[in-house]
Amino acid sequence: RAIDLYTGKIKWTYTGVKGYIETRPLIEEDKVIFGAWDNTLYALNKNTGEELWKWTGGLTRMHFSPAAVWPVAANGKVFITDPQRAMTAIDLATGETIWRTYQSTVRETIGLSTDKKRVYSKTMNDSIVCYSTQGDKPHQLWSSNVGFGYEHAPSMQVEKDGVMFGSTKGGLIFALEPLTGKVLWKYKIGNSLFNTVVPI
């Protein structure tokens, strides 16, 4: 539902979601886009709540839902990852799949470069990968071995001031050079899961 910022009154309600929602929604153009634990990514009109499209990508098991990832958008595409270890580019206007790749075994994390030319994701073992947001086929630009081991925490990659930041389930925070993937530094703060970092 959408709630008026100043009055607290409900502006619209959408009742078509069949699973629970944990993601941060993406606001892009006239759309609000989010996934839920029902195999579905939803796009609604941000002003009215009208359903514009739904994407399932053929997912049939609830545990493969694109629900934990925070969707990002660039060049007319929405980019997501999911527990089926795939990265997907979806047409922002229609909800049709442009491409879907299992090449890097990514899972439930994604980040967008500040110039919107690249998306980042975390693999399930050691590495960060970077793909181009341009074109209609998946194009990996680099892969960087950060050395964090087995990983499945849904913490997103964040770029700021020419540095890409990330974190892990094992308490590691790291920084990479966005164009090459070169590891700039990494620091283990503890042994617990770290959520998405917020560089300031």
Map each language-model feature to its residues.
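Short loop/turn segments that connect beta-strands within beta-propeller blades
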Residues: D4-G8, N45-T48, D91-G95, S132-D136, ...
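Hydrophobic beta-strand positions that form the internal "hydrophobic ladder"
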Residues: V32, V78, V119, V163-M164
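Surface-exposed, flexible loop/turn segments at secondary-structure boundaries
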Residues: T40, T60, A86, S127, ...
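Short, loop-centered acidic/histidine patches that primarily coordinate divalent metals
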Residues: K169, L176-P178, K188
